[in-house]
């Protein structure tokens, strides 16, 4: 007996126990797929015959259970991503072509033992966040067929939430790999742009497109991402990962301030967002309200600025001869770019960089952002009556993410007070924090505790839990000119340093103002037996390479040694050679360098 949701950890456990085989799983997939009442989920399902043949072939070539990372795992593919042997249409029948090769990501997943169960429906040419812009019909919410599934990766999200795929591939330009996750009680893994190859994908906005992963748990999604990722020289937008870390303690989480909160009248989603804030606070995070304005203005550039011309560039030749084959709303959006000029494109780029600079103020005080995935939802009828404006509501908190080069993980946040529809939140951080975000996203998902996909009662498997990654960041205690707001603080912030906490040393340290230093610097020494109140200091973290460079620049008579803090911990920090204190003014009684400097102002 298979679970309702075919999560990766559960299937692997069943395979390891010999309880089921890939062929058994495929038979259940065939049965569930046929019985599902929503017939708009797939554009081209893999035939029953081919599914059985794929399972049998896998078992013959790799008979040992779990001998491949995704051995016997069923997955669906959005129909703007190539699968050899199945047509690619981008939800436009006249655009159909038959690829001879898999997309790079699909090839990697198949090589790892995963089995494609079909090509899924989408908003045509991945233009939309709602799922209604397709000639094949609109996939629906698995919780209420009156409601949209979310898009553009509509069918992909349903396959996982309904229980006939373990994971599914989507794409994400403006939120298409995150909004459907929120509406289907799923996880949406939105990698750093360039982490997954886009070769074999029909572009929407090629410079910011990402292949994404829908999964039941964060652990499942990360496991799939690790198989799929990797530099691809054939893709000019592919990037080699330069992994970044997040603080393991003292994490600062940015949340919407009052002025930028907009839920379009949906108080239920707002309550779930507030609950998520309290949940992440319970995990030890410091909550930091921030001004969303520059992020919102960057988001507006995707559809209201020159980036819409990138959608025209993707299909320019085809729309010139086949305009009548387009969904009317999609056609209107793409043809609206025809008047855009190169001057507008450059001005748009300049504006984006201005806004990026403005967002640096937020990233200086927050390590991660926690935002609603979508501030509201609508019925299919409501969406069709007002397709552009209501669609834009879904993207209010998603459209900026790729433009500003961020990683994101969308997770379920629970259900409304009537236990009817789900909502989600998204954790967002700068590029290549993908791995660092995962443990936090997993912990937050587990606190929501509302199952997986359509199975609200399901328990997230312990086997899929994402462990906290050990930090390689190096802590350092600063005493004087490197404190926040002091002249040399930029030597910490420039190479990616993060303030962890303000605290005090143990009581046996003394502080002196060193004569002739520019900018003025203190010297701190430890004197066993001295009974003071401790000195005000800050603990920062630096990447290892930056720490080494930082220490190498420290001028005599200063150096680095272990400093004992008032909590008994010992951390590397600034100390002074005793010879330099001859004739120096003692300023210990001020309690710290900042207070001493203020006393001289």
Explain the meaning of each model-derived region.
Residues 19-27, 56, 265-291, 315-321, ...:
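Acyltransferase
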Residues 102-228, 402-415, 421-426:
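Short glycine/serine-rich loop segments
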């Amino acid at each position: 007996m298979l679970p309702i949701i075919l999560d990766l950890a559960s299937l692997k456990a069943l395979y390891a126990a010999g309880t089921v085989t890939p062929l058994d799983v495929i038979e259940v997939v065939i049965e569930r797929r046929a019985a599902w009442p929503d017939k708009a989920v797939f554009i081209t399902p893999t035939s029953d015959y081919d599914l059985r043949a794929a399972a049998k072939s896998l078992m013959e070539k790799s008979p040992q259970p779990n001998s491949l990372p995704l051995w016997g795992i069923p997955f669906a593919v959005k129909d703007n991503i190539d699968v050899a042997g199945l047509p690619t249409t981008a939800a436009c029948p006249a655009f159909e072509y038959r690829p001879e090769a898999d997309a790079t990501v699909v090839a990697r997943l198949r090589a790892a033992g995963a089995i494609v169960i079909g090509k899924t429906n989408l908003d045509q040419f991945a233009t939309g966040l709602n799922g209604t812009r397709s000639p094949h019909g609109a996939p629906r919410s698995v919780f209420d067929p009156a409601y949209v599934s979310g898009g553009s990766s509509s069918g992909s999200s349903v396959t996982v939430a309904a229980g006939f795929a373990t994971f599914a591939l989507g794409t994400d330009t403006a939120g298409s790999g995150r909004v459907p996750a929120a509406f289907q009680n799923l996880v949406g893994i939105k990698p750093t742009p360039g982490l997954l190859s886009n070769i074999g994908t029909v572009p929407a906005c090629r410079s910011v497109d990402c292949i994404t992963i829908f999964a039941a748990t964060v652990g499942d999604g990360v496991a799939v991402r690790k198989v799929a990722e990797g530099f691809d020289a054939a893709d000019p937008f592919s990037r080699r990962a330069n992994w970044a870390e997040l603080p393991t303690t003292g994490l600062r989480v940015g949340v919407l301030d009052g002025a930028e909160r907009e839920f379009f009248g949906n108080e239920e989603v707002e309550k779930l967002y507030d609950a998520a804030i309290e949940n992440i606070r319970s995990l030890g995070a410091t909550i930091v309200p921030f001004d969303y304005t520059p992020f919102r203005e960057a988001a507006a550039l995707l559809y209201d600025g020159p980036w819409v011309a990138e959608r025209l560039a993707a299909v320019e030749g085809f729309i010139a001869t086949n305009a009548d084959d387009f969904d009317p709303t999609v056609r209107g959006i793409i043809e609206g770019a025809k008047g855009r000029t190169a001057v507008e494109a450059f001005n748009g780029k300049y504006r984006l960089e201005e806004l990026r600079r403005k967002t640096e103020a937020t990233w200086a005080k927050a390590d991660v952002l926690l935002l609603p995935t979508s501030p509201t939802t609508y019925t299919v009828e409501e969406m069709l009556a007002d397709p552009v404006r209501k669609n834009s509501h879904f993207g209010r908190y998603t459209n900026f993410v790729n433009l500003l080069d961020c990683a994101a993980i969308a997770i379920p946040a629970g259900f409304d007070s009537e236990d009817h529809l789900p909502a989600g939140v998204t954790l967002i951080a700068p590029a290549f924090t993908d791995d660092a975000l995962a443990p936090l996203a997993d912990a937050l998902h587990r606190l929501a505790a509302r199952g997986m996909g359509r199975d609200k009662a399901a328990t997230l498997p312990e086997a899929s839990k994402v462990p906290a990654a050990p930090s390689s960041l190096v802590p350092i205690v600063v005493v004087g000119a490197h404190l926040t707001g002091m002249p040399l603080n930029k030597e910490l912030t420039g190479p990616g340093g993060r303030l962890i906490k303000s605290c005090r040393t143990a009581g046996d340290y003394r502080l002196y103002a060193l004569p002739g230093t520019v900018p003025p610097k203190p010297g701190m020494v430890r004197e066993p037996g001295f009974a003071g109140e401790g000195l005000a200091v800050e603990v920062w973290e630096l990447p290892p390479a930056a720490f080494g460079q930082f220490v190498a620049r420290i001028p005599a008579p200063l150096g680095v040694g272990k400093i004992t803090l008032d909590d008994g911990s010992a951390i590397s920090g600034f100390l002074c050679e005793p010879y330099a204190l001859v004739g120096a003014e003692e300023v210990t009684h001020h309690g710290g360098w900042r207070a001493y400097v203020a006393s001289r102002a």
